[in-house]
Amino acid sequence: MEPTEKTKLLEQIEQWNSKDEYSRCIWVIEAIPEQERGYLLTVKLSRAYSNLAVLGDHREHGTDGEVDGNLIQHAIELLESVRFRGENDPYWNARMGYSCLMAYCSASTAYKYAKRWLTLAPKDPDAQKLVRDCEGYLEEEKALEI
């Protein structure tokens, strides 16, 4: 894929994502052979699966709290496939943190990635929020154990 084509594709994916059209993102990215996708498109594909699992297209899941376990697990598998490249990338850690939080209904795994994200991007307010959220969830989990 030519660099200008890839740039246009990434812009289009961002537009679809902002319009909650996650299935469109998935269809377009998966039409590209896996060996040609590269790191960034793989992470974007994971994001689309994660968002579809939690929110659904056009937020059809609303606020019901239902998560499609198969889709969120696939999102994590995609991230795992590029772990070597992503471990030091704030965006990869963000996606892994959010996906793990939704997949496991436990903050302990997500917290590890949230902390790494915050280390890599200490001024990112979203990273700060995910760390705080995970800490709150961990406190709640601990209180339930007592």
Language model features with spans:
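Canonical positions in the second alpha-helix
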Residues: 31-32, 81-82, 116-117
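Structural marker of alpha-solenoid helical repeat scaffolds
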Residues: 34-35, 84-85, 120
